[in-house]
Amino acid sequence: MISSLLKKVFGSRNDRLLKQYRQTVARINALEPAMQALSDEALAAKTQEFRDRLGKGEKLDDLLPEAFAVCREASRRVLGMRHFDVQLIGGMSLHQGKIAEMRTGEGKTLVGTLPVYLNALSGDGVHVVTVNDYLASRDAGIMAPLYNFLGLSVGVNLSQMAHDDKQAAYACDITYGTNNEFGFDYLRDNMVFSVDEKVQRKLAFAVVDEVDSILIDEARTPLIISGPADDNIDMYQRMNAVPPLLKRQETEEGEGDYWVDEKAHSVLLSEAGHEHSEEILTRLGLLKEGDSLYSATNITLMHHLMAALRAYSLFHKDQHYVVQDGEVVIVDEFTGRLMAGRRWSDGLHQAVEAKEGVEINRENQTLASITFQNYFRLYGKLSGMTGTADTEAYEFQSIYNLETVVIPTNKPMIRKDSQDKVYRSAKEKYDAILADIKDCHERGQPVLVGTTSIENSELVANLLSQAKLPHNVLNAKEHAREADIVVQAGRPGMITVATNMAGRGTDIVLGGNPEPEIKAVRADDSLSDADKNARIEAIRAEWKQRHAAVLEAGGLHIVGTERHESRRIDNQLRGRSGRQGDPGSSRFYLCLEDPLLRIFASDRVAAIMDRLKMPEGEAIEHPWVTRSIENAQRKVEGRNFDIRKQLLEYDDVANDQRKVIYQQRNEILVEEDVSDVVINMREGVISDLVDLHLPPESLEEQWDLAGLEKTLASDFLLEVPVAEWIKAEPNLDIEQIRQRIVDMAAAAYQAKVDQAGDGVMRQFERSLVLQMLDNHWREHLAAMDHLRQGIHLRGYAQKNPKQEYKREAFELFADMLERIKRSVVQVLMTVQIRGQEDVDAVEPHALPDFEMQHAEPGSALGDDEDNPLSPEALASQGLRINRNDACPCGSGKKYKQCHGRLA
């Protein structure tokens, strides 16, 4: 009440920001006549003038009005597009490191040119981040003439690009690329063996297109670079026979062997299921007679069994993945795109391959990983654009410290969004959808049908084919034709069926887009200039007629075949219609069999239908129902936010360690001579050994002289007669003994250096330290994974899992650093280097074979199959937690407000 009153008096934060921006817009507009008066050469020369002024101490903010005016005028001349005032406002918010929410069709790509130009003047490089290679190439191609006119270079960073091409792309003033590629390049740069092999420069400023898709939807999926580990391929094939022999429980407490929890996306084996599984595995010869699945020797069996069960019951063909050319290819659940080359981790991908009967690839070992949250927080300044950010403004603020600014539209939005229609069965729903599409088609109104999976898009396409309605299908299988289909989706009577429209990046122009036809005419050398002009005029006249017909029919009509679990993605689908003040309409059709309703709201809605005695084919259409569904979506969004936040809290621990290791690694890469590092390591290892065998402030009788001599001889080839020294000099103290051993080790090592040559040994030392650092870091990553997977069990011992994780992770890290030092010193003291050829033989010249993995959302949290914090799992273990008790996950919340909320 009070806050709404204050807003009325003072305006919201958004209103106040827009007011500030409009004052700057007035200054930019005042400069426009002066800019228009400049010649092309004088306008382009402004870039160097700005750079000179920056060199003399001026700030980017001081240059902003003039730089924006220059960019706008250059855009008008080169691209034929002049920035609207609201686009200038969007550009200012991006320059300030904020998120600009701009409706579809408001020209986000053009808005990005303003802050990109301004920040590229500093010479540190600007990264423009998009969701796929197609958009990166397209946007770079469209905008390159503008930037080149202004004297800036543009590069595109694509996957599968040659190393030299990548370096060239990053060396440009502006680099376009995908979020995955930027992240993977960062990880790869921290695996190279020479500074010259690095591709990235300083991470100064990034503009993220479709920022909600990248920083929120994909923030649950860590980027992982992994290499093959030794694994038993045969095990996956044999284990694939088990799930069909087990019985799925109809209800959580019902009879059967396992329960599929769709909310938690997990599979839980019942007590009977454990026993039945053991019988089957014994029969298959995988388990010894009388042996238990839980014995220490059978840990891998349990891992394989749960992977097979999850592949069998949770991951479905044409929804979560497709089989293409004998390979299982993941489908991105947020964009519906195929993610070639990405693999699920934890053996799940191999289990799916076994299920589909395709060739199984080896399980992988993590070589490097990072979450998008921690990668993008490495940038000095981060900003983003999207059509739908306001629903997630709190998350952007709390995790990335990014403020969301809602930019007003250039023209008022007049799209009509109708209430949801809810039917009892899928058949009734699809009948209604078909009737709606048919009506639009007959009236010449274009329709975009949005689906949440490839499976659903093909189902709708089949229904349209049966009804003899012409249509285009836009899903991950039609990747190549994607842009062409979207461009023409606004033609009269056109029907387009599409999976999630997030990140499609192409506006649907009412009447279809005439530009491809015009481009083809211009490229036709067989036509004279007069013929070309005549044809182009005819194409434009024809488009005007089509455009008018579509406006008359009501603009683009959006049909949603079901609600997504996120309101934002529903809003993205709606946002395809009503661009730049065009008319349009939208409606979602739902039924009680839809996943969202089935899991969260079916009982309530079914009860209403029963009470009203609704006949078949009748739909509920009421604001209360729509509100109820949005509340269900809010619940899912809140849960997903909790998962991402928890993932970040855990990854922050790993991130601190990652920064230390990568910084140390970079220092070694830069140095040609790491002998000082080696000396410190050697002295540290010897000092620790002396402390272990001759504890400080201990009596001489407690010293283990024999143990010290034996360790020095066996591990470091040092024959050190400590006992004889003490016999000869009874007053010798520990510090003197320590110094003598250090001096002996230094002398022994110097003899090796003299024999092999100083340059050869310096090269070998550097190579060895890098290899040991990498090897132990990989082992540490695996240890951290295992620690994370079981850490939530500490909640049952009344300990805080996060605190325990931090404490143990620190101990693991400290232990790893000690092992690195000892390994390096041990090898250097024992190795025999004869000359350069020995160093060349052991020095790595290239990165190991690896692949980029797309880990399953939430897997980095250690959400293993038997999640003991789910209400179902707690009940199956006979544990009853009072709703007001502290939640065992260690969050500090009451159980009813934490994991109990999901019951």
Swiss-Prot record:
It catalyses: ATP + H2O + cellular proteinSide 1 = ADP + phosphate + cellular proteinSide 2. Keywords: ATP-binding, Cell inner membrane, Cell membrane, Cytoplasm, Membrane, Metal-binding, Nucleotide-binding, Protein transport, Translocase, Translocation, Transport, Zinc. Its cofactor is Zn(2+). Zn(2+) binds at residues 887, 889, 898-899. Residues 565-584, 855-877 are annotated as: Disordered. Its EC number is 7.4.2.8. Its main location: membrane. CDD domains: DEXDc_SecA (cd17928), SF2_C_secA (cd18803). ATP binds at residues 87, 105-109, 507. May bind 1 zinc ion per subunit. It holds the Pfam family P-loop_SecA. It is a peripheral membrane protein. It is found in: Cell inner membrane; Cytoplasm. Belongs to the SecA family. Monomer and homodimer. Part of the essential Sec protein translocation apparatus which comprises SecA, SecYEG and auxiliary proteins SecDF-YajC and YidC. This is Protein translocase subunit SecA. It comes from Chromobacterium violaceum (strain ATCC 12472 / DSM 30191 / JCM 1249 / CCUG 213 / NBRC 12614 / NCIMB 9131 / NCTC 9757 / MK).
